[in-house]
């Protein structure tokens, strides 16, 4: 493992901008509004050859522990456990505030080395704040501008004596780990995104899987803003072995007309982006509300993106008429998602843990189908049988000739059908072939792409 460096500070001092600067990507949402970050976010950082894991945290606020800001602070405090260094960030232009002083008192009680950073130090406006920062008791602050990348060399000099040797120790282990990883199929890490409407229990579900309060939860809708990726090992009780999973928690997605807040728009866009990087997407429903139109829109979006889809009815422990609810949702899904019938539907409880092993088992199975490749010979044997059972129509008395089919890609499975006059092939016959591929060749409820290709007419102008 790399050395771990966490970023701590009050809201809106530029912690997420610093995080993005160090990882070299815009992974964390950034806005002028304070309190954008709510959950811890991890990233691989490299600073002038110094490699470490950087952790962005929620802004530190002096609030009651039962409130949302109070629970965010508890998450930030928990991030100190196991950290090698803490970057304590203040706003040089604002100077030292009473909340900065409170954070400093807390950090002085910790055994974690502290690097004080005076962010927003570009120009002369930050000079008084840099001078004030000495009063916090952590020595000379690193004058920095996360927005413009100024002060990277000074930060490197501050971190090198604290994690440089640890990085050298880890490098040897890393080389061994890389050698071991080369023996594994890269498909073995399941990239699993959790999506759904706000307050469906997505973060509670992930916390139950992990066995810790890793993500903020509560009755307030829309707590999660960033898409948070967590690498984790699931113990498969059937195999009696651990299997690697990358869990991706996303912001709740409401109807577009209801999304007026700029931050929520950023969060929904981030959730859509997370789906792109997932292999399997679990759409979480709230059993107390059932299936709504917005759920079908989210499911359709996942299918359009070509991801393997599963539906999990959460809060099953408080569902009324469970049997009727399950059957009603099953029927509505089959009618509303005609392009992918038989999507896996599971009843779970993020609070009690009911059905979670079954959920992970089904996720690995549908990912295997999503990644499957059928040999061309076997594919065309099925194709010949399908044509014999139901020949293509002959519009206007002229026969549509279907020659052969091949699988062009996987993840999602994509097939190319070759023939003549394919522009006149009815959509119903195309669906017949897609459903046959899914049913007969073991693709289950995976989205299938079928491209029609006719030979070019050499005499056409």
UniProtKB/Swiss-Prot annotation:
Any single biological process term in GO: ribosome biogenesis
Keywords tagged on the record: GTP-binding, Nucleotide-binding, Repeat, Ribosome biogenesis
Repeat is among the record's keywords: yes
GO molecular function: GTP binding
Domain (KH-like) ranges: 372-456
Pfam families: KH_dom-like, MMR_HSR1
InterPro entries the UniProt entry points to: G_ENGA, GTP-bd, GTPase_Der, KH_dom-like, KH_dom-like_a/b, P-loop_NTPase, Small_GTP-bd
Keyword Repeat attributed: yes
Highest rank taxon of the organism: Bacteria
Signal peptide stretch: none
Binding site for GTP 1: 9-16, 56-60, 119-122
Binding-site positions, GTP 2: 196-203, 249-253, 314-317
Job description of the protein: GTPase that plays an essential role in the late steps of ribosome biogenesis.
Sequence similarity: Belongs to the TRAFAC class TrmE-Era-EngA-EngB-Septin-like GTPase superfamily. EngA (Der) GTPase family.
Subunit note: Associates with the 50S ribosomal subunit.
Name listed for the protein in its UniProt record: GTPase Der
Source organism of this protein record: Novosphingobium aromaticivorans (strain ATCC 700278 / DSM 12444 / CCUG 56034 / CIP 105152 / NBRC 16084 / F199)
Lineage: Bacteria, Pseudomonadati, Pseudomonadota, Alphaproteobacteria, Sphingomonadales
Gene responsible for this protein: der
């Amino acid at each position: 493992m790399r050395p771990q460096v966490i970023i701590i500070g009050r809201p809106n001092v530029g912690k997420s901008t610093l995080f993005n600067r160090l990882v070299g990507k815009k992974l964390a949402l950034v806005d002028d509004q304070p309190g954008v970050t709510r959950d811890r976010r991890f990233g691989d950082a490299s600073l002038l050859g110094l490699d470490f894991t950087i952790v962005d945290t929620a802004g530190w606020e002096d609030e009651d522990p039962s409130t949302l800001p109070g629970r965010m602070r508890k998450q930030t405090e928990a991030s100190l456990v196991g950290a090698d260094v803490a970057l304590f960030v203040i706003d040089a232009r604002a100077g030292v505030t009473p909340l900065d002083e409170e954070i400093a008192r807390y950090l002085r009680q910790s055994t974690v080395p502290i690097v004080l950073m005076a962010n927003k130090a570009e120009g002369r406006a930050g000079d008084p704040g840099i001078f004030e920062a000495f009063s916090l008791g952590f020595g000379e602050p690193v004058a920095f501008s996360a927005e413009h990348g100024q002060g990277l060399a000074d930060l490197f000099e501050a971190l090198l004596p604290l994690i440089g040797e640890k990085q050298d120790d880890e490098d040897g282990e890393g080389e061994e780990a890389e050698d071991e990883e080369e023996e594994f199929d890269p498909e073995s890490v399941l990239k699993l995104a959790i999506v759904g409407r706000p307050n469906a229990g997505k973060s509670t579900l992930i916390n139950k899987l992990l066995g810790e309060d890793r993500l903020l939860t509560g009755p307030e809708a829309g707590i999660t803003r960033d898409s948070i990726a967590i690498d984790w090992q699931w113990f498969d009780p059937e195999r009696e072995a651990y299997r690697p999973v990358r869990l991706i928690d996303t912001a709740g997605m409401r109807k577009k007309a209801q999304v007026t807040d700029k931050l929520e728009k950023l969060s929904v866009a981030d959730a859509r982006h997370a789906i792109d990087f997932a292999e399997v997407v679990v759409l979480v429903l709230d059993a107390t509300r059932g299936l709504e139109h917005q759920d079908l829109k989210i499911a359709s979006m996942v299918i359009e993106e070509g991801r393997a889809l599963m539906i999990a009815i959460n809060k099953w422990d408080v569902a009324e008429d469970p049997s009727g609810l399950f059957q009603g949702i099953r029927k509505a899904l089959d009618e509303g998602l005609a392009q992918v019938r038989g999507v896996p539907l599971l009843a779970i409880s993020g609070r009690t843990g009911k059905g979670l092993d079954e959920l992970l088992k089904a996720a690995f199975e549908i990912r295997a189908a999503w990644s499957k490749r059928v040999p061309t010979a076997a594919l065309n044997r099925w194709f010949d049988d399908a044509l014999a059972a139901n020949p293509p129509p002959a519009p206007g008395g002229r026969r549509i000739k279907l020659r052969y089919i091949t699988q062009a890609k996987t993840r999602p499975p994509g097939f190319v059908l070759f023939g003549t006059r394919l522009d006149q092939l009815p959509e119903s016959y195309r669906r017949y072939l897609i459903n046959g591929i899914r049913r007969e060749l073991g693709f289950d409820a995976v989205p299938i792409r079928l491209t029609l290709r006719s030979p070019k007419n050499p005499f056409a102008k």
